[in-house]
């Protein structure tokens, strides 16, 4: 399997398919690059080069006991980009991966980034603070941490079968395969990485990163996202990025890249080609 060694020696797994213009994908917590299957296949079949890595401690990347913070996540992405010699890249991030994209573009992307896409992304800041009163109370994330410690396997089943894909909504078209694949990805990763990653995605303030992004940016968000509520994420982020456009998807969930892949893929392709 292909790996790149990050600056601190951590082995980062990546996929690299196709030979056209590069599109790089950044997955969400606590998943892996496999979460992008629908997008990778869709774009590689249309002549694009697609790259997706597993975040440290996630998927097939090394389960190291350190560096589970957004600065390391962005630096690891930069190591993949440098290793492959990528330029003119469109970076696509979902959820926590959207935060990774924001920090990567702001700190490492000069001269290499063509466009950015943030899907159901956590920026600018998830947790409630004095300066972010509309954020989610820290007790929400304390509950996540407790669930990871107590019974991570059951917690991941509950997330996937409930709010992540909107399977808890009346009339939802529930897919056991989607649920099991989410659980499989989560349980492949490191419990420590996932535990510490909760702080990374919930308490990192991306305001300055968003302001530093100077490439065309598409922000995509479902208005029934129960994991990253749209009001304090996408609707704020679009006001901070200089050249951003927000597309809202009525009734769609946090997991729309999987359960509404046709819709997401069509809009993603349109933005890439614009």
From Swiss-Prot:
The AB hydrolase-1 domain, residue ranges: 22-254
Top EC category: oxidoreductase
Can you tell me which residues form the catalytic site?
95, 225, 254
InterPro entries found in the cross-reference section: AB_hydrolase, AB_hydrolase_1, AB_hydrolase_fold, Epox_hydrolase-like
User: What does the record give as EC number?
Assistant: 1.11.1.-
- Record-level Gene Ontology MF annotations: peroxidase activity
Signal peptide start-end: none
Keywords of this entry: Oxidoreductase, Peroxidase
Tell me the protein family, please: Belongs to the AB hydrolase superfamily. Bacterial non-heme haloperoxidase / perhydrolase family.
Q: What is this protein called?
A: Non-heme haloperoxidase
State the organism named in the record. Answer: Rhodococcus erythropolis
In the record, what lineage is assigned to the organism producing the protein?
A: Bacteria, Bacillati, Actinomycetota, Actinomycetes, Mycobacteriales
């Amino acid at each position: 399997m292909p790996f790149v060694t990050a600056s601190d020696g951590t082995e980062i797994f990546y996929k690299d398919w196709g030979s056209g213009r590069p599109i790089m994908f950044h997955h969400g917590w606590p998943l892996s690059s496999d979460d992008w299957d629908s997008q990778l296949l869709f774009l590689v079949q249309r002549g694009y080069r697609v790259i997706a890595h597993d975040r440290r401690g996630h998927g097939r990347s090394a389960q190291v006991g350190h560096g589970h913070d957004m600065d390391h996540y962005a630096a690891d992405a930069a190591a993949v980009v440098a290793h492959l010699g990528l330029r003119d890249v469109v970076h696509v991030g979902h959820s926590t991966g959207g935060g990774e994209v924001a920090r990567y573009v702001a700190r490492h992307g000069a001269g290499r980034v063509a466009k950015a896409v943030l899907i159901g992304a956590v920026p600018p800041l998830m947790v409630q603070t004095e300066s972010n009163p509309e954020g989610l109370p820290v007790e929400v994330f304390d509950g996540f941490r407790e669930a990871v410690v107590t019974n991570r396997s059951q917690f991941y089943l509950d997330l996937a079968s409930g709010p992540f894909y909107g399977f808890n909504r009346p009339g939802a078209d529930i897919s056991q395969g989607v649920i099991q694949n989410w659980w499989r990805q989560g349980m492949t990763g490191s419990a420590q990485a996932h535990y510490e990653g909760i702080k990374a995605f919930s308490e990192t303030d991306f305001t300055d990163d968003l302001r530093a992004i100077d490439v065309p940016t598409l922000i995509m968000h479902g208005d029934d996202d129960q994991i990253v509520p749209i009001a304090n994420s996408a609707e704020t982020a679009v006001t901070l990025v200089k050249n951003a456009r927000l597309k809202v998807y009525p009734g769609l969930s946090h997991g729309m890249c999987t359960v509404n892949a046709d819709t997401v893929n069509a809009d993603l392709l349109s933005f890439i080609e614009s």
